[in-house]
C-alpha cells in the first residue's frame, strides 16, 4: 500500500502534527507514506527529516487543476500491480484537498486509487453541484466525533451514508512523561492546587469566562452560595500557550482589573506540553465554540488528571459527568467556578475522577485504539 497525505496549511499546527503522528505510525507498520504539501520550508523540512517523500504543490483548492495534474503524474509513475495490496490511498484532511485528490485520481486513470478524507471541523455540509460531485467521488468521509457528523448531516447533503464514519482523534503519549517542576519554576507552594489550560490563547477558548470564574473563586459570597468554605484551598491557574499580542495583553489586563494577577500564571508556549500537563492537578477547557474532538482533555486524562470542560463539543463524547470529569455550559462563569471549586477543595474527588480518566484513556481513547480504527477507513 502507498499512502499520500495531503496537507495544505501554510504553517505548522495541530493538523500538521496529526498527519505527522499518523504517518509515522503507518511507516512503523511497514506502509510507504508520502506527503503532498505547500512549498513552505518549515513544513517541508519537518516531514522530510523523517525520511518520507515530500512533494510540494500549490494546493490551491477546488479550482487548482495544475496541482491535480502534478499529483496525477506522481500516481501514474508509481510501480503498482493490479492487486489489492498495491492500493494507493490519497488521504485528504479538508474538502479543498479532497477535490484535488479526486481530480488527480481521474486524471491518473488508476483504479487502485482510493480517496478518503478526515473532517476535523464541526460545520454544516454544503450541497452545491460542485460538492455533490465531490461526495460521489469520495470513497470515505470520516468525522472526528458524532457531533461533527451530525452537524454535517443537518443540511442533508447528498452523500451515500455508507461512506460516512466516526473515529475520535487521539494523541501519541510517550512511554514515560516526566513532569516539569513548575512549582519551583513559578514559585508555587507545594499545597497549592494547580488548574491548567493549554492551547491557543483565543477568545473562542472561553478564556475570558475562565478568568471570570477565577475571580468568583475569590468571592466569599459566591463560595457561601455554593456551599464552599471561604477561603478555598490555595489554588492557581496556569495558562500555557500563546495568542496574538493584543489578546494576550487583554487577558493580562482583565486579570489585573479583577485583582487576580496573583492567581494566574501566563507560562507562554512550551514544547513538549505533556510534562506541563503532568504537573497540573486538573485540566480546563472552557471553549465557547463547538470543537469536534479537542485533544487537550485527552492529554490530562492520559496523565491521570480530571478535567473541567464545556458541554458543547465532541469532548462530551468521552468526558463523562462525575465519572472522569465535570461538564459545564459554555460561557457560564458561575458553573465553571463551581466545578473548579469542587476539584480544588476535594482531593479525593480529584483522585477518583483522575483514576477513571486514566483508565478510560487507556481503554478506548489512546493512539493504539485510534489507529486500529483509522486503518479500517482505507478499506483494503
Task: Label the predicted regions.
Residues 1-230, 234-380:
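Membrane-interface segments of envelope glycosyltransferases acting on lipid-linked substrates or membrane lipids
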Amino acid at each position: 500500500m502507498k499512502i499520500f497525505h495531503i496537507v495544505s496549511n501554510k504553517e505548522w499546527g495541530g493538523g500538521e502534527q496529526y498527519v505527522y503522528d499518523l504517518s509515522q505510525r503507518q511507516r512503523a507498520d511497514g506502509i510507504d507514506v508520502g506527503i503532498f504539501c505547500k512549498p513552505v520550508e518549515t513544513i517541508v523540512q519537518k516531514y522530510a527529516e523523517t525520511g518520507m517523500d515530500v512533494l510540494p504543490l500549490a494546493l490551491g483548492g477546488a479550482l487548482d487543476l495544475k496541482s491535480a495534474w502534478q499529483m496525477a503524474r506522481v500516481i501514474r509513475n508509481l510501480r503498482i500491480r493490479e492487486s489489492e495490496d498495491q492500493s494507493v490511498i490519497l488521504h485528504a484532511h479538508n474538502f479543498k484537498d479532497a477535490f484535488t485528490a479526486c481530480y488527480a485520481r481521474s486524471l491518473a486513470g488508476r483504479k487502485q486509487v482510493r480517496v478518503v478524507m478526515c473532517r476535523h471541523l464541526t460545520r454544516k455540509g454544503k450541497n452545491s453541484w460542485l460538492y455533490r460531485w465531490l461526495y460521489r467521488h469520495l470513497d470515505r468521509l470520516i468525522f472526528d466525533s458524532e457531533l461533527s457528523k451530525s452537524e454535517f448531516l443537518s443540511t442533508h447533503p447528498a452523500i451515500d451514508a455508507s461512506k460516512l464514519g466516526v473515529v475520535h482523534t487521539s494523541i501519541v503519549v510517550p512511554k514515560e512523561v516526566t513532569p516539569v517542576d513548575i512549582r519551583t519554576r513559578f514559585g508555587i507552594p507545594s499545597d497549592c492546587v494547580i488548574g491548567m489550560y493549554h492551547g491557543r490563547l483565543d477568545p473562542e477558548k472561553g478564556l475570558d469566562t475562565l478568568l471570570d470564574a477565577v475571580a468568583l473563586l475569590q468571592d466569599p459570597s459566591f463560595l457561601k452560595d455554593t456551599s464552599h468554605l471561604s477561603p478555598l484551598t490555595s489554588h492557581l491557574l496556569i495558562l500555557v500557550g500563546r495568542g496574538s499580542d493584543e489578546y494576550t495583553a487583554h487577558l493580562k489586563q482583565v486579570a489585573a482589573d479583577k485583582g487576580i494577577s496573583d492567581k494566574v500564571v501566563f507560562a507562554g508556549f512550551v514544547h513538549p506540553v505533556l510534562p506541563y500537563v503532568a504537573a497540573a492537578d486538573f485540566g480546563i477547557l472552557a471553549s465557547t465554540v463547538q470543537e469536534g474532538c479537542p485533544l487537550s482533555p485527552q492529554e490530562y486524562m492520559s496523565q491521570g488528571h480530571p478535567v473541567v470542560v464545556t458541554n458543547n463539543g465532541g469532548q462530551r463524547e468521552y468526558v463523562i459527568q462525575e465519572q472522569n470529569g465535570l461538564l459545564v455550559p459554555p460561557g457560564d462563569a458561575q458553573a465553571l467556578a463551581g466545578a473548579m471549586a469542587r476539584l480544588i477543595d476535594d482531593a479525593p474527588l480529584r483522585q477518583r475522577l483522575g483514576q477513571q480518566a486514566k483508565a478510560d484513556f487507556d481503554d478506548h481513547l489512546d493512539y493504539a485504539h485510534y489507529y486500529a480504527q483509522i486503518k479500517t477507513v482505507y478499506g483494503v
